[in-house]
Design a protein with these regions (language model features):
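C-terminal motif of bacterial Sec signal peptides marking the signal peptidase cleavage site
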Residues: 13-16
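Hydrophobic helical h-region of N-terminal Sec-dependent signal peptides
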Residues: 6-11
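Conserved alpha/beta-hydrolase "nucleophile elbow" surrounding the catalytic nucleophile
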Residues: 125
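Active-site-proximal alpha-helix that buttresses catalytic centers in soluble enzyme cores
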Residues: 21-22, 28-113, 117, 129-132, ...
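Positively charged n-region of N-terminal signal peptides that target proteins for export
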Residues: 1-4
Length: 175
């Protein structure tokens, strides 16, 4: 029930932002959603690029459901199986291709996101997602703990100034 309330509040806010015809026509407003990849399988043979756990797959599908009514122009991930697998259900449901970005070049990537002025989903890592949100908003936001997977950073950019909304989306894992 709590998740449903958060979703409705989120959708109301998103819709109220997109109803401003003047802002939409001028491309002055757009929204970037940043998430960390879902749970990775640390028991996998390839520890440098492990797949998602069953819970991670569920979380990724839940993210797609969460973003079902949200307009997206583009989806970005790093070049790892776990980030691409997290983004895949959303990309598939929206008919979008996944574009790769370099997590070692966050400052340049943040500027690209601002310059492109597109509604986007960015899937990253615990040490990049908060940092990127900070670059987009001018705030000092660092990395977060490795056991945190429920954060969605919603950054609304209006006239090149970002405003951050931190959302928490929990998943009841059936693993």
């Amino acid at each position: 029930m709590k998740n449903l309330f958060l979703l409705y509040a989120f959708l109301i806010f998103t819709c109220s932002c997109s109803d401003d015809a003047n802002a939409q026509n001028n491309k002055d407003i757009f929204t970037i959603y940043l998430v960390r990849h879902s749970e990775k399988d640390l028991s996998a043979n390839n520890l440098s690029d492990p797949p998602l756990t069953l819970c991670g797959v569920q979380r990724s599908e839940n993210l797609s459901d969460f973003l079902k009514d949200v307009h997206l122009n583009i989806i970005y991930t790093t070049d790892y199986l776990r980030t691409k697998s997290t983004a895949f259900p959303t990309a598939n449901s929206k008919g979008l291709e996944i574009e790769l970005y370099d997590a070692q070049q966050l400052k340049d990537f943040s500027q690209l996101l601002i310059d492109r002025q597109q509604d986007a989903l960015v899937v990253g890592h615990s040490n990049t997602t908060g940092v990127l949100a900070g670059l987009l908003t001018g705030e000092d936001i660092g990395a977060f703990d490795l056991d945190i997977y429920d954060r969605v950073y919603q950054v609304v950019i209006y006239k090149n100034k970002g405003r951050l909304h931190l959302l928490h989306v929990s998943v009841d894992c059936n693993e």
